[in-house]
Amino acid sequence: MSRIHPTAIIESGAQLDESVEIGPYAIVGANVTIGARTTIGSHSVIEGHTTIGEDNRIGHYASVGGRPQDMKYRDEPTKLVIGSRNTIREFTTIHTGTVQDKGITTLGDDNWIMAYVHIGHDCQIGSNVILSSNAQMAGHVIVGDHAIVGGMSGVHQFVRIGAHSMLGGASALVQDIPPFVIAAGNKAEPHGINVEGLRRRGFSADAISALRSAYRLLYKNGLSLEDAKVQLRELAAAGGDGDEPVRALVDFVEQSQRGIIR
């Protein structure tokens, strides 16, 4: 029995594993590759130079691999690459990259992308990320592993969301969120360390304590950003479970181009 509904349109050149399931009225473009056991919901459109891994579930009416919403785009063969075991719910839009960046949009593994999410051109979404319903990622946004973005939130282009961080619902984010930090509001402001999330992911009490100390240096002690970075480096060399996560935090802060939320 065919796993492709008779009303679906599969353009010549598309490469589909024989176990892929395609729902009614879905369209798969000529330059699309889809891996084993992936399911495509009814009325979805998978187009562009798009590669999708294994065991993904793409919901009804999703638009995956569409042209970037960038007025400079001139039909260059830019790409979208999606990993494995992702859930991409109904009405989500994910666009290919642009040549002004690296020419590719990426989505890692084991992500939970809820309904009506937008992932713009050149975004880099890590693994084990949750993007809640109606979260909107502008172009060039980077989201680290295990980050959570609340529903109805808007993220400005080129913003970075650090690993294990959390952005509350209905927030407007215009600068970077450091790893491990909770942020919320319009505009988004810091609200502490994501303690519960870190506990769930097996971070030790010592590591969480070190991150809390790092947060105080960054946000609570009245230090300038430059002075805070010096003390964060000292904290990262203290010895113990907290060294690596604190080092990741200060590296992120030092590499920020848009500045961090303060």
From Swiss-Prot:
Single GO MF annotation: acyl-[acyl-carrier-protein]-UDP-N-acetylglucosamine O-acyltransferase activity
Family matches, as CDD domains: LbH_UDP-GlcNAc_AT (cd03351)
Domain of life of the native organism: Bacteria
Pathway participation: Glycolipid biosynthesis; lipid IV(A) biosynthesis; lipid IV(A) from (3R)-3-hydroxytetradecanoyl-[acyl-carrier-protein] and UDP-N-acetyl-alpha-D-glucosamine: step 1/6
GO biological process: lipid A biosynthetic process
EC number annotated for this UniProt entry: 2.3.1.129
Chemical reaction(s) catalysed: a (3R)-hydroxyacyl-[ACP] + UDP-N-acetyl-alpha-D-glucosamine = a UDP-3-O-[(3R)-3-hydroxyacyl]-N-acetyl-alpha-D-glucosamine + holo-[ACP]
SUPFAM superfamilies referenced in this protein's UniProt entry, alphabetically: Trimeric LpxA-like enzymes
InterPro entries tied to this protein: Acetyltransf_C (IPR029098), Acetyltransf_C_sf (IPR037157), Hexapep (IPR001451), Lipid_A_LpxA (IPR010137), Trimer_LpxA-like_sf (IPR011004)
Annotated Gene Ontology cellular component terms: cytoplasm; membrane
Localization in the cell: Cytoplasm
Keywords: Acyltransferase, Cytoplasm, Lipid A biosynthesis, Lipid biosynthesis, Lipid metabolism, Repeat, Transferase
Subunit description: Homotrimer.
Role played: Involved in the biosynthesis of lipid A, a phosphorylated glycolipid that anchors the lipopolysaccharide to the outer membrane of the cell.
PANTHER family: ACYL-[ACYL-CARRIER-PROTEIN]--UDP-N-ACETYLGLUCOSAMINE O-ACYLTRANSFERASE, ACYL-[ACYL-CARRIER-PROTEIN]--UDP-N-ACETYLGLUCOSAMINE O-ACYLTRANSFERASE, MITOCHONDRIAL-RELATED
Family classification: Belongs to the transferase hexapeptide repeat family. LpxA subfamily.
Protein's name in the database: Acyl-[acyl-carrier-protein]--UDP-N-acetylglucosamine O-acyltransferase
